[in-house]
Regions:
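C-terminal lobe and adjacent flexible extensions of AdoMet/dcAdoMet transferase-like proteins
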Residues: 209, 227-286
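Catalytic cores of RNA-modifying enzymes
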Residues: 1-228, 257, 268, 277-284
C-alpha cells in the first residue's frame, strides 16, 4: 500500500505552518489529505518502478511523496513561488525528485525532458481545476512518449473527458482528446478529502494513449480544426456550422456523402472516427 506522510490534516497544517504558508485559492490549491485516495491513484497509475512521472501542481508534495516510492523519478511543475522552499526540502531528501517553478502551460516539452532526464512516460497529478482540461490535452499533444495520465479534476471536467457521443457533455474538447487517448478508469473523490474542502466534487480519471486513431499522412491539427468547426455553432446542423467556419458547402456535401454522414446531423452525435473520416475527405481540398 502506497501512502504519503502528509496525507492527513495535522501533517499538512504543520508543514504549512513550518514554512509560513497559507492555502491560496487563487491558484486552486486544496491539499489532498486522504491516504485512501492516494492509494487508489497509485493503483490506477500502475507504476512499475521504471517510469519517469510528470506531476503538475504538487502543492506541498503530498501526492509527490507517494509517487517517489514507486517511480524511477518524479518531475513536478509548480506555479506558486512560495512553495519552492517546501519542494527544495523534498528534493534534499529524494534524489529522484526534480521540479520546475513555472506555469505548466508555459513550460516546453524540452524543458520538461531536460529536468526529467528523458521524456516523461506517465502523468499523475492533482491538477489545478481552472486549467486541468487544457493541460491534459496539451500534454498528450506535445509529449508522444506519454503513455497514460491519472489525474484529479473537477467532476464536471471528468464528465467532459469521459463523455460519449450523444451525451450533453460531449463536445469538441472530448473529440479532440479522443484523437490521442481514451478514458480507461475513474473514481469519485468527495470534498472532505481535501484541506480546505472545495465547494465542488472531484474525480480521478485514467486516460491511456491510443495509437492509430489518425492515419499516417493526415494532420491531427487539421482534424482538430474540423472538430472545432463542427462544434462552433452547436445548435446548428453540422453542415451549417462548418460552412459558417471556413468550409465550402459543396465540398462538405461530398465529404458527408463519402463518410455516410447526414448533413442535418449535429456534431455531438458523431464519434471520433467520423471526424477523422470527414477530415480525411476534406483534406483533399484543403
Amino acid at each position: 500500500m502506497t501512502t504519503s506522510p502528509l496525507a492527513n490534516p495535522t501533517a499538512t497544517r504543520e508543514l504549512l505552518e513550518e514554512f509560513g504558508l497559507a492555502t491560496k485559492h487563487r491558484l486552486g490549491q486544496n491539499f489532498l489529505i486522504d491516504n485512501h485516495v492516494i492509494e487508489r491513484i497509485c493503483e490506477l497509475a500502475e507504476l512499475a518502478g521504471d517510469e519517469r512521472v510528470l506531476e503538475v501542481g504538487p502543492g506541498c508534495g503530498t501526492l509527490t511523496l507517494a509517487l517517489l516510492q514507486e517511480a524511477a523519478c518524479v518531475t513536478s511543475i509548480e506555479a506558486d513561488p512560495e512553495l519552492e522552499p517546501v519542494l527544495d526540502a523534498h528534493a534534499a531528501d529524494y534524489a529522484n525528485f526534480r521540479f520546475i517553478m513555472d506555469d505548466a502551460l508555459r513550460v516546453t516539452p524540452e524543458q520538461i525532458e531536460q529536468a526529467a532526464g528523458g521524456e516523461p512516460t506517465v502523468f499523475v497529478a492533482n491538477l489545478p481545476y481552472n486549467v486541468a482540461a487544457t493541460i491534459i490535452l496539451q500534454f498528450f499533444q506535445t509529449m508522444p512518449a506519454l503513455k497514460r495520465a491519472v489525474v484529479m479534476v473537477q467532476k464536471e471536467v471528468a464528465d467532459r473527458i469521459a463523455a460519449v457521443p450523444g451525451n450533453k457533455t460531449y463536445g469538441g474538447y472530448t473529440a479532440k482528446l479522443g484523437l490521442y487517448a481514451q478514458v480507461t478508469g475513474r473514481f469519485e473523490v468527495p470534498p472532505r478529502c481535501f484541506m480546505p474542502a472545495p465547494h465542488v466534487d472531484s474525480a480521478v480519471v485514467r486516460i491511456d494513449r491510443v495509437d492509430g486513431v489518425v492515419p499516417e499522412g493526415l494532420d491531427r491539427e487539421f482534424v482538430a480544426r474540423v472538430i472545432d468547426a463542427a462544434f462552433a455553432q452547436r445548435r446548428k446542423t453540422i453542415r451549417n456550422s462548418m460552412s459558417a467556419n471556413g468550409f465550402a458547402k459543396d465540398v462538405l456535401d461530398a465529404a458527408f456523402e463519402a463518410c455516410g454522414i447526414a448533413p442535418t446531423t449535429r456534431a455531438e452525435t458523431l464519434d471520433v472516427a467520423a471526424f477523422v473520416c470527414l477530415a480525411r475527405e476534406l483534406s483533399h481540398d484543403a
